[in-house]
Design a protein with these regions (language model features):
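A compositional/biophysical signature of low hydrophobicity enriched in polar/charged and small residues
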Residues: 1-87
């Protein structure tokens, strides 16, 4: 997860039909969202949110992400441990 960030979550998002790209653009305005991708399958988007604590991540989800118009539902997964390869 990076040295400056202590907590991360991945969020699977279901969007209203046709709103996927619009929501992806709006997520660019949420600084804690460090990655976001359109998907094919059961979910429409996956996003990664990083912050200083789980409390901060919860606040970002409740006050910023979940309030974006067109988001129908989310499934949040809390990162416990991991690594990332730099290419």
């Amino acid at each position: 997860m990076g040295d400056e960030k202590k907590a991360a979550i991945f969020v699977l998002v279901n969007c209203e039909i046709g709103k996927e790209r619009e929501i992806l653009e709006k997520l660019k305005n949420v600084p804690e969202v460090t990655e976001a991708y359109l998907l094919y399958g059961v979910y429409d988007l996956i996003i990664k949110i990083e912050g200083e604590s789980n409390d901060q991540l919860r606040e970002v989800m409740l006050s910023k992400v979940r309030r974006i118009e067109g988001i129908k539902s989310t499934l949040t997964m809390v990162v416990v441990e991991g690594f990332a390869r730099k290419h």
